[in-house]
Each structure stands twice: as C-alpha cells, then as structure tokens.
Regions:
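Conserved active-site and SAM-binding loop architecture
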Residues: 1-211
Length: 211
C-alpha cells in the first residue's frame, strides 16, 4: 500500500509490528503505532490514515470460538471474550487517530463485534474487482472517502471447479507459521486502486490548500 501511494508522489509511510518486507525501512516504522504517535508530531496531522487493526477475534469466521467447545449452548468462553474486547478497543484506538480522511480495514464481522465497535460507513471489495483472480472480502470503514471503484472486474469461476479452488487459496491456506501473515496480506490490485483513487483526492486537497 505504501509503495503504491509513493509511486504517485504522496509521502506515504507505514507502521507495523513486523519489518518492512520491501527493505524500505526509511519509510517504515517498525513497532507499535501507539509507541510512535507521542514521539512523532507529524503523525497528528495526517491527510489520510489507512489502518489495519488486528481483526482475528472480530471475524465472523471465528465467532464460534466465543463459546466453550465452540458450541453456543456450552456458554461463553471468557478468555475469548476478553480477547474480543481487547481487539475492539484496539480497533477503536486506531480509528480515533486524528486524520482528515480515514479508511480502516476490517473483516466480515460477527454481530457482537459490529455492535461493540459501532461500525460506520463500510464498503466490501474483492481482489477480482481489481484484476486479481482471488476471493477475499476486504471491508473498509470509510470517513470522508468514497468507496473504491472496480478497475478490472473479472468473472468469478463456478463453485466446485478447479479454478474456483485456486481462487479460494486464501481460505484454503494450510496451518503453519506463515498462515496468518499470508491470509492478511493486501492484494496489489486493490492497493493500486486505493492509491489511484484516494491518492487523487489527497493530491487535490494539497493543491487546494496551497492555492
């Protein structure tokens, strides 16, 4: 995402608990965003915030883990509910970072997370909207931004076909140390669309402010 915006002349920076995969450490803050915020004054005057809060406990696919033995009739799983509450507070904290325009990534959430977060305007997009043959619903909670428009919409294959299985690679990712990272990775086509469409708005804002 950072690379796509920088290619369009926007001074984009990233922050993650992991190092930058592209080696551009000069534009990447390695660590907790809330560690850097008090020490980095320019972060309090952002034109655009694109946030990627941890969403594991909020995803609808994991709702069953909120209950003991993954069965609602067994009653709530206190540990998992505590994780959910912590995840919700983290999401809210990321969303509260001051910025003129915001796009906060989120999964297809279960109703408990939706209620606790108080979700605002939201759009869901798919990689195949932007020319990449994969299924992965990505939600964006948007503030002062339009939804992304498809740039190269493909035709999804029929369920049960080999091609459909290939498109479902994200959901079929096998267990392993890299599973979470691979499943959360942003697709290039969507990043390019965000940089082109939202980046144009940021550049227009800058031109208007300079006029």
């Amino acid at each position: 995402m950072r690379q796509a915006f920088r290619r369009r002349g926007i001074d984009a920076r990233s922050c993650d608990l992991k190092p930058a995969e592209d080696g551009e450490a000069v534009y990447h803050y390695h660590g907790d965003i809330f560690h850097f915020l008090p020490k980095t004054p320019w972060m309090w005057d952002l034109d655009l915030l694109i946030g990627h809060p941890v969403c594991r406990t909020m995803a609808n696919s994991g709702a069953k883990h909120l209950y003991l033995g993954m069965r609602k009739e067994n009653g709530p799983n206190p540990a998992r509910w505590a994780e959910l509450e912590a995840g919700v507070e983290h999401y809210k904290a990321v969303r509260a970072i001051p910025a003129r325009r915001k796009a906060i990534e989120n999964p297809v959430m279960h109703p408990h997370a939706m209620r606790m977060i108080g979700m605002g305007k939201r759009q869901f997009v798919q990689p195949w909207w932007f020319g990449e043959p994969f299924f992965k619903a990505t939600g964006w909670e948007l503030e002062n931004l339009p939804g992304l428009s498809p740039t190269n919409k493909l035709t999804p294959p029929k369920p049960g076909t080999t091609e459909h299985k290939a498109w479902s690679a994200v959901h079929r990712e096998p267990p392993g140390p890299e599973r979470a990272a691979n499943r959360s990775r942003s697709f290039i086509g969507m990043c390019e669309a965000a940089a082109e469409q939202w980046g144009a708005i940021i550049l227009a804002d800058a031109m208007e402010a300079a006029a």
